[in-house]
């Protein structure tokens, strides 16, 4: 197996999000691409990563290879990764995966391939009443500001805008609309609102580095779905259960 990806920062952003979700994770590396699914211990949130082979600079995977790893160790390993450095993934045996960070200096790490059981994911057929394409940096800032004042993020939407807010001793309210350029597109079925644990959203905020816009979907008292579409066809989907009063 030999894989080359030309910007390690994307993987770094994904691992940062996984670190807050699970202690261990499993990359399912197949000839057609890489997948990963993880569910937090409380079964409140789920992350699904899909990286097709076309998005890699080099991709030679003759047969399926499962790579289990400790998220904290992987995060430390990638901490020093620089802009536009390549990451090279090699494996000559199922026991050890060699990761090379290639830039001004080549740093090589031999990572033990640990046994990680894939999570059992129930079949869900979610229907959303609001589907909005929102500026990623704007959403990042809004979540961060709400996390400073409240433990719950309230989101609502109509045919023209999406509003997120948090209330504690202070109040933060952020509006995304086409007039301000923060809302690229919206699909509207009916006015909807729901509440979510802002800490869970703040934990995966690194994913906003993957794309300029985030697809946000929700409905009354239903899970929220965030979809990050990467260059080359990669996609990271995050589902968060609602906070029920």
From Swiss-Prot:
PROSITE patterns: PCNA_1. InterPro entries: DNA_clamp_sf, Pr_cel_nuc_antig, Pr_cel_nuc_antig_C, Pr_cel_nuc_antig_CS, Pr_cel_nuc_antig_N. The keyword Transmembrane does not apply. It comes from the Archaea. GO terms for molecular function: DNA binding; DNA polymerase processivity factor activity. Keywords: DNA replication, DNA-binding. Pfam families: PCNA_C, PCNA_N. GO terms for biological process: leading strand elongation; regulation of DNA replication. CDD domains: PCNA. Belongs to the PCNA family. Sliding clamp subunit that acts as a moving platform for DNA processing. Responsible for tethering the catalytic subunit of DNA polymerase and other proteins to DNA during high-speed replication. The trimeric complex inhibits DNA ligase and both 3'-5' and 5'-3' activity of Hel308 (Hjm) helicase, but stimulates Hjc, the Holliday junction cleavage enzyme. The subunits circularize to form a toroid; DNA passes through its center. Replication factor C (RFC) is required to load the toroid on the DNA. Forms a dimeric complex with PCNA3 and a trimeric complex with PCNA2 and PCNA3; does not form homotrimers. NCBIfam families: pcna, PRK01115.1-3. This is DNA polymerase sliding clamp 1.
